[in-house]
């Protein structure tokens, strides 16, 4: 029986499920599912519809089942800087804001009041981009501290 491995790539404008298997010592890739994606405005903020994305992930898994190609493992790749805050019952806290939203403008200076840019870079090695997670978290700290 063939073994299948599923990679789910969720990008800014679409998501896809790529199924991999080995045949004669070579990797075979097959796109089994694709869906549109994008942020929508919610409460004045560009947000991801995380619940719909979860549904799309499950839809792609159903396609694998229909094809009789059940993956033995699965990996999901998304946008490196976005996140979802959860409460103690695993419920989403607040809006699932996306990196393309402008709410982080000016948050770099707020962060540097706590840790200078040089020290931040020394700790993380990450290039400064105003949409980085640390600036997004500063927005939450400044505007919705009860979520932290």
For each predicted feature, which ranges?
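N-terminal glycine/serine-rich phosphate-binding loop of ATP-dependent small-molecule kinases
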Residues: 1-95, 122
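Glycine-rich phosphate-binding/catalytic subdomain of phosphoryl-transfer
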Residues: 62-148
């Amino acid at each position: 029986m063939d073994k299948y491995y599923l990679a789910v790539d969720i990008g800014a404008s679409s998501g896809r499920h790529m199924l991999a298997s080995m045949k004669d010592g070579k990797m075979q890739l097959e796109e089994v599912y694709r869906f549109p994606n994008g942020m929508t405005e919610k409460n004045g903020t560009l947000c991801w519809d995380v619940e719909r994305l979860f549904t799309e992930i499950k839809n792609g898994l159903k396609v694998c089942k229909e094809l009789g190609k059940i993956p033995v493992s699965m990996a999901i790749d998304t946008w490196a800087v976005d996140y979802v805050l959860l409460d103690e019952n695993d419920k989403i806290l607040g809006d699932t804001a996306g990196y393309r939203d402008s709410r982080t403008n000016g948050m770099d200076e707020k962060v540097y009041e706590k840790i200078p840019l040089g020290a931040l870079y020394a700790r993380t090695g990450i290039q400064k981009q105003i949409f980085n997670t640390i600036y997004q978290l500063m927005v939450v700290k400044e505007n919705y501290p009860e979520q932290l």
